[in-house]
């Protein structure tokens, strides 16, 4: 039998050579132009070797694995269009999944038996690499390739004194990846998620068409793709809004022993989005008692002395958890003289435990790239490439205290997780409901992230235990059972019915958009939303032709 790699290449080559290598180029205002791509050039970019397929069979989660038949390394977006059109030329199309840095946790970027597109190869011409990030200072935007890392977008924009407005906590992930989900962070209460800060996209659809879209042109595709989980197209370029960049940050954490003032103060802070009196960034963390008394003795923010004081607070108050609001106040040379006074005035409005306010002064880049430094520490300790059974939820404000009581004081009461638990509110009116991303039906909702790791020999429990706890949390949240009514962020559902409940009233629209832009369901199969259609039935035998068993 021919080895799998050789067989795959042979079948693809022979089938591809039978197609016409004629592609559609980007659609601008409905005008089509032609673009020829050599079939042999496309074939040379499909890698079926063990190293390539093995890397593409795992992700940051290290929980599920699925091997593709090949990895495609495109030089241009038109190469991706050619690959998709090749798939569509087959009686049974192969699936295609774009992969950035592989930071998904449940195989969302997998293509079992199909082709994974290594987006990082875009712009790589062998002898040189095109830097696919261009800043318009006059019009205050940056054009960034879908494969570009946010950390590189940051550094490029800062050369012009500009910055995007909203950041995920971790910056070494791709533009296309976060925009396919939403892209949330501590600035989202003020500016919405990253998808609310996009002016224009270049997209390769599941039909192999290269289309430029915006809220005004090809708007159905634009709104479908943003938060669309890769179901309608591959983002190859995004035009992202910029603003003047600050130079430094007052980085603050304030502690609470009770969830009620913690949530009240967070909601007060995000209500100040239209004024200049509040924080520019608001997030929050939940630290379970056992992680203080039995966890590490220092962190990238807290000193050993700080953690000892926080441990004492937990013991003295008998709290199951200590809650932190994390805030950031940006400033530059013009506001440096007044920032401390502004911060003090804001803190006076809040009801944290007096004496438990911690302030650091950091550069803007140091603050934004804080998780990058933590990554280096975890890699050095061998604690980065481990299973990450993460669970991210959006919880309605009306149910957040119930969630806290049932989860942090119930399901996880005796847990000692390795990792973080995030909890912070956002304003729903900063989201655009025309986009595919889903949020609860309340004006304010909380992002809750159980960002836990299964570290070998650690005290956080094994993967199975963490998964059981996640399942209990999801059961609590399940809408079908009359639960809290959460929505998953970076969602994973094991059934079609689960996806129907996830999208709710949007399900019909999502299904219609799928039929329009990816009718053969070849894109991003790892999400498990739309199964590919079955292969066509063979034609009946001609009259007099013997019927043979297959």
From Swiss-Prot:
Which keywords does this Swiss-Prot/TrEMBL entry list? FAD, Flavoprotein, Glycoprotein, Oxidoreductase, Secreted, Signal
Q: In which broad location class does this protein mainly occur, judging by the first location in its UniProt entry?
A: secreted
Q: Where is the FAD-binding PCMH-type domain?
A: 64-245
Listed under catalytic activity are:
N(6)-dimethylallyladenine + A + H2O = 3-methyl-2-butenal + adenine + AH2
**Gene3D superfamilies associated with the record:** 3.30.465.10, FAD-linked oxidases, C-terminal domain, Uridine Diphospho-n-acetylenolpyruvylglucosamine Reductase, domain 2
Q: According to the UniProt entry, where is the signal peptide?
A: 1-26
UniProt name for this protein: Cytokinin dehydrogenase 10
Which species is listed as the source? Answer: Oryza sativa subsp. japonica
Its taxonomic placement starts with: Eukaryota, Viridiplantae, Streptophyta, Embryophyta, Tracheophyta
